[in-house]
Amino acid sequence: MTFPLPLDHEHLQKLVTADLVRPDHLLGAHPTTEHGVQGVRFAVWAPNAQHVSVVGDFNDWNGFDHPLQRLDFGFWGAFVPAAQPGQRYKFRVTGAGGQTVDKTDPYGTFFEVRPNNASIIWQQDFEWTDAGWLEQRARRGQALEDPISIYECHVGSWARRDDGWFLNYRDLAHRLGEYVTYMGYTHVELLGVMEHPFDGSWGYQVTGYYAPTSRLGSPEDFKYLVNHLHSLGIGVLLDWVPGHFPTDEFALAHFDGSPLYEYADPRKGYHYDWNTYIFDYGRNEVVMFLIGSALKWVQDYHVDGLRVDAVASMLYLDFSRTEWVPNIYGGRENLEAIAFLKRLNEVAHHMAPGCLMIAEESTSFPGVTTPTPEGLGFDYKWAMGWMNDSLAYFEQDPIYRKYDHHKLTFFNVYRTSENYVLAISHDEVVHLKKPMVLKHPGDWYAQRADYRAFLAMMWTTPGKKLLFMGQDFAQGSEWNHDAPLPWFHADQPDHRGVMNLVRRLNELYRERPDWHTGDAREEGMAWISADDTDNSVYAYARRDTYSGAWSLVIANLTPVYREDYVIGVPQGGEYRVLLSTDDGEFGGFGTQQPDLSARDEAAHGQAHALHLNLPPSSVLVLEPVAAAPVKGLVSRQELTPELREVARQSAQAVQVERAADPRPNEQQRLVAETPAHEGGRSAPADAAESAEQKPDDEQKGGKKA
């Protein structure tokens, strides 16, 4: 429960100078008592407005009953005794040009169910029981050496009621919690939570940055969801969109009749791809609005982290546009956005210890997960390069894969440059891209076998994991945000096999330190064989960076049975099977290994060798029976000259791309020298900036429309 601060000069000045990180404690609608009278204090930022009043159920939407008083620095406020929790309201704003528009509260914590959009006065009251979880989260911190397996879930379409309406957050809590616990995920990442008017935006065109969508219930219902998942040991992450906002007249757009939350110049402030506006990161009140939103979720709603959407669109002034305005150095980086992101991550980590800040950043921008001040300060970054290379490889007919063998080895060249999440997200199963299992070539059996191999390689490759809902039971259709998942698939043997595999992968990932402690370390993975291009076979070891315990991964990525295949190993003795994607439990044939004794023969630079039978399109994971620390594993440098040349050319291509403008070292210098936001422009209280503004982001449209 929060209490409003006095609307005095000192507190308003702190907001203007970016010293008040929770502006929602000052602005918005706050039930309170003044001079012994109960009512609601309303406050809003509209520096260029001619007149502002609050209208709602308490005054029959009459704009003359409760005018707001103009305060210092462009703020307006009033105490309304007639107002009470549960009533609807809006701000009636007469802008600089004389036009009057009813606006929803930017700091509103609850809204009507779409298509209606009025804000609702809300007295939040919830008894949390997750203090132990929050203490553990703070101790865990960045969790670089912990297993993190994320189940990405769209709250509006994971499941529905029998009548087709959305589940309540409380119902979702129990059903989702039971499923995620059974499958062994450590976290859920929820999209579509923050209030948005258009279902087809998937929640990526936000109008309520401080409010969970009312489609699924009240703020207390959402708190119940988070609290219940914490009781099951499941972390909760949210998708958060500080890169752009919709042009709907009732919300943030031209809030006081002029560009306010958005850049005034359309070359900086308008996303042509998505028909959305870009936040003005140079304006303190806007920066604090966004940082306050982030803190609302990680503090008040106990959320464990935010996946920041479309970071690339924020970083580059020329992102998806031909006309753009250079920064003060003549470059294409948005220095104000860089400063904002650094301040955001610093404040979030300080105010909510242990919360994870994850960037969806699709370029080679340096230092995304480097701590501030040298870097942006995120904890993790999505591995978009790994995703693109892996899908491009697995979508090919196996007969041609030998020509792109490097696509599955290249990630290891740069995997320690950032802290990565290997993400197969909602973006990969929409817009005719096909569901994951159907991306693979061949008949239905071949597709499932190949998909199982992909999943096993994903879970044994260094990096945290994220898988979108439905893909863990091989959903046979693209995601439809207007319909629940086809859960009947989960009861069919073909789909159940993939589901069993993901469950087993999560189990091994959580239990085996060699599968997660070295995610961000060079020694966490070593190639045994990275150059068998003709057979499309890969072999690598995962190693616990503390005990030295290790496991061996062998992937046969063609539909060819390979008998007596030789793999070098550093340790003699007996081995056992930890996992085979060809097991009958997973939908395979159940190929057996007749002999798992290492022979004293040299292979792949190792002193011993195993002779294995490799099932078609499969991954086999082994461990030595007599576990012993092993340090002499062949590293990724152990590539053939041909593969080294391919890797060199690929790396060179990345450098050429980085050199576009400016060079990477210049970019790194700019990042390091750009301080976290310390107070940029504050909005003038009497004069509006001219021009329009409209930005561009990553790719929203149907995706995030």
Curated annotation (Swiss-Prot):
Keywords: Carbohydrate metabolism, Glycogen biosynthesis, Glycogen metabolism, Glycosyltransferase, Transferase. CDD domains: AmyAc_Glg_BE, E_set_GBE_prok_N. The active site is at D309 (nucleophile), E360 (proton donor). Its EC number is 2.4.1.18. Residues 691-705 have a biased composition (Basic and acidic residues). It catalyses: Transfers a segment of a (1->4)-alpha-D-glucan chain to a primary hydroxy group in a similar glucan chain. It comes from the Bacteria. One of its GO terms (cellular component) is cytosol. InterPro entries: A-amylase/branching_C (IPR006048), Branching_enzy (IPR037439), GlgB (IPR006407), GlgB_N_E_set_prok (IPR044143), Glyco_hydro_13_cat_dom (IPR006047), Glyco_hydro_13_N (IPR004193), Glyco_hydro_b (IPR013780), Glycoside_hydrolase_SF (IPR017853). GO terms for biological process: glycogen biosynthetic process. GO terms for molecular function: 1,4-alpha-glucan branching enzyme activity; cation binding; hydrolase activity, hydrolyzing O-glycosyl compounds. It is an enzyme of class 2 (transferase). Gene3D superfamilies: Glycosidases (3.20.20.80), Golgi alpha-mannosidase II (2.60.40.1180), Immunoglobulins (2.60.40.10). Residues 654-705 are annotated as: Disordered. The keyword Chaperone does not apply. Catalyzes the formation of the alpha-1,6-glucosidic linkages in glycogen by scission of a 1,4-alpha-linked oligosaccharide from growing alpha-1,4-glucan chains and the subsequent attachment of the oligosaccharide to the alpha-1,6 position. Monomer. PANTHER family: 1,4-ALPHA-GLUCAN-BRANCHING ENZYME. Belongs to the glycosyl hydrolase 13 family. GlgB subfamily. This is 1,4-alpha-glucan branching enzyme GlgB. It comes from Deinococcus radiodurans (strain ATCC 13939 / DSM 20539 / JCM 16871 / CCUG 27074 / LMG 4051 / NBRC 15346 / NCIMB 9279 / VKM B-1422 / R1). The gene is glgB.
